[in-house]
Design a protein with these regions (language model features):
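Hydrophobic/aromatic residues positioned on beta-strands within the core alpha/beta folds
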Residues: 134-135, 158
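The feature encodes the CheY-like receiver
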Residues: 105-108, 139
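Helix N-cap/capping motif at the beta->alpha junctions
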Residues: 74-87, 109
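Short amphipathic alpha-helix used as the core "switch/output" element in two-component signaling
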Residues: 110-126
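Non-catalytic signal-transmission and effector/linker regions of two-component phosphorelay proteins
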Residues: 1-45, 60, 66, 124-127, ...
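As written
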Residues: 145-156
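Conserved acidic segment of CheY-like receiver
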Residues: 3, 43-55, 59-63, 98, ...
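Active-site residues of response regulator receiver
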Residues: 96, 101-105
Length: 189
């Protein structure tokens, strides 16, 4: 099976969920066989966080050009992300998705994601913003554990052969899977 998150052929496993057995990626856990394909409408704000300006610009442009987001907020650090999110929460402005690079300094993507969940609790937001971790590294067990703690959370490998066209196709497919249920998920209790 090909995993759009990892950007390569992967080993898979079966998982019981939603009343059926799903085939999932053995690296990142993304369901690979879905019953419907959804192309999400470009609504809401997507926040992109990456300390590499090339990828920050690439993702911002792809989200806009592919119609996956009506508004894109770009942040060059985890600290900037948390500041921008706090301001949006105070103004009660929604965020549809947060895309976080994992390897950033001094505040990495996982720490920023955990801080996001704390902010959501502090602002008493009923819905958790889906998080998409974006990295050149393969999904490790530590990342899968962090994704569980930050749920709903997903993973997209930057890919070594990621042309803008290939990355756009993988992002469209992943967005369809993330938003197939209609958007943000309830924050775990």
């Amino acid at each position: 099976h090909y995993c759009p998150s990892c950007g390569e052929r992967v080993f898979t496993y079966g998982a019981e969920g939603h009343g059926r057995t799903e085939i999932r990626c053995g690296y990142c856990g993304l369901p690979l066989e879905m019953t419907e394909s959804v192309r999400p409408a470009g609504s809401g704000c997507v926040v992109v966080v990456d300390d590499d300006r090339f990828f920050l610009t690439l993702l911002t442009d792809l989200l806009t050009q592919e119609g996956l987001a009506a508004e894109v907020l770009s942040c060059e650090s985890g600290a900037s992300f948390l500041t921008q999110l706090t301001q949006r929460f105070r103004r009660e402005q929604p965020v549809r998705l947060a895309i976080l690079d994992i390897v950033m300094s001094p505040l990495d993507g996982v720490a920023a994601a955990l801080a996001l969940r704390a902010l959501e609790r502090g602002f008493d937001r009923g819905e958790a913003i889906p998080i998409l971790f974006f990295s050149a590294a393969k999904a490790t067990e530590a990342l899968r554990t962090a994704m569980g703690r930050c749920a709903p959370a997903y993973y997209l490998n930057k890919g070594s052969d990621a042309t803008p066209e290939r990355l756009a196709a993988r992002m469209r497919e992943l967005f369809g899977r993330v938003f197939a249920g209609g958007g943000a998920a309830r924050r775990p209790a």
